[in-house]
Amino acid sequence: MAQIKADEITKLIRSQIENYETKIAVDEVGTVMSIGDGIARVYGIDKVMAGELLAFPHGVAGIAMNLDEDQVGAVLLGEYTAIKEGDEVKRTKRIMSVPVGEAMIGRVVNALGQPIDDKGPIVTDKFNPVERIAPGVIDRQPVREPMATGLKAIDAMIPVGRGQRELIIGDRQTGKTAVALDTIINSKGKNLICVYVAIGQKRSSVAQVVKMLEDNGAMEYSIVVVASASDPAPMQYIAPYSGTAIAEYFRDSGRHALCIYDDLSKQAAAYREISLLLRRPPGREAYPGDVFYLHSRLLERSSKLSDKLGGGSITALPIIETQAGDVSAYIPTNVISITDGQIYLETDLFNSGVRPAVNVGLSVSRVGFSAAIKAMKQVGASLKLELAQYRELAAFSQFGSDLDKATQAQLNRGQRLVEILKQDQFQPLPFSKQITIIFAGTNGLLDDLEVKDVRPFEKALYEYVESANPQLFRTIEEKKALDDAIKADMTKTIKEAKERFLSDRKAAKAGA
């Protein structure tokens, strides 16, 4: 029989007592009282914070939105069908955050920052809160650097600056997304990180956008955040905030970011759905009372930081879809009053072949002109004036047939100016080319061309300058202003290009 050694047992017990650690895991938990339509009512978590992340069973997260006296109304971010009444809910004691950093570039993520592009996990140890207070007045500086879109109609007459919020507004199928995507493509090599947030769109449409960005080499500096039409309303509601949080990382590191929200009408509809399910009192058009704050707190985060904070910026291009051109509806008027201007796209212009279909009369940029380069201001000011006069005369000329020579000449020039502002999709132009063709139009150098020949001539002009006088484009880019010598050189080159173009046309007709 084995002998029991008391000293060994004592030694063993002593070592176990010495190494004993008293660990008590304390979680604040509540109970699901009712669940349905992506909304859970939870009892027992009295000390929860507004907007706090809650842990539900089966790995589903929720956000505490309604803090009532005896219960908490939470919205669920994911598949909630497996959650049932009586399930346990834990507090996480943290506000929702998304992963940020260099690893996000080139990726397609959902509203929680999780990758959905089958390219593996995103490896980063940096996180930004989804909701964040916008920079204060002292932390900002005025908009003074241009943010080129590559579109003649916008860069010349409605310029956008870094740190600006410029609304793109119009009916469905007027080219709103195309304007935003042209801006992304034009940002190549300009030290700009682009964040495209797709809210409530068809997945096929988003896949098309991603494919187009890849084909144009734009995914190398872009991030796509997706909350599609099939995602729960809470995901569509937080997607723009997640996109901004991702962009803020680049702004805070002294770089420049562009945020496109496509579109905020669907985010407002998702927020209305959540609010009505949470039994918040409805207001105008059934939207809750704080729907203005929904968009203002989002768009105020786009800013140009002071040099002391690194001088980084976020430029916002929110998109709003109108119904039958009604810009006086609730959400459009809200966002117009928050932003620094709007680009209004019109169905009639789009259908008549004017693309981008920018209505220059209703579009405005409230701060962009202080950011525009001098050369663009020089040609853009006269362009806007001549187009305004043309529209007035065009409306007037419908009533009378006998027009004097001056009026007829102005109408003819207006037709050519409308023609030079047309541009093919995904063909953004550098400032130098835009300035050259607008200079030609506003100085009457295209008046003797047929209207149908204006666009073919524009293409021929760029080719001629690049082969015969490439220094012209370089000089405009470097000096950023037009002096008499540059104007004389431009006039001479444009006239030479026109002579060659007309002689080529004549020869082609003779040969035919």
Curated annotation (Swiss-Prot):
Belongs to the ATPase alpha/beta chains family. This is ATP synthase subunit alpha. NCBIfam families: atpA (TIGR00962), PRK13343.1 (NF009884). Keywords: ATP synthesis, ATP-binding, Cell inner membrane, Cell membrane, CF(1), Hydrogen ion transport, Ion transport, Membrane, Nucleotide-binding, Translocase, Transport. Produces ATP from ADP in the presence of a proton gradient across the membrane. The alpha chain is a regulatory subunit. It is a peripheral membrane protein. The record marks 363 as: Required for activity. One of its GO terms (cellular component) is plasma membrane. It catalyses: ATP + H2O + 4 H(+)(in) = ADP + phosphate + 5 H(+)(out). F-type ATPases have 2 components, CF(1) - the catalytic core - and CF(0) - the membrane proton channel. CF(1) has five subunits: alpha(3), beta(3), gamma(1), delta(1), epsilon(1). CF(0) has three main subunits: a(1), b(2) and c(9-12). The alpha and beta chains form an alternating ring which encloses part of the gamma chain. CF(1) is attached to CF(0) by a central stalk formed by the gamma and epsilon chains, while a peripheral stalk is formed by the delta and b chains. It comes from Koribacter versatilis (strain Ellin345). The keyword rRNA-binding does not apply. ATP binds at residues 170-177. It is found in: Cell inner membrane. GO terms for molecular function: ADP binding; ATP binding; proton-transporting ATP synthase activity, rotational mechanism. The keyword Cell inner membrane applies.
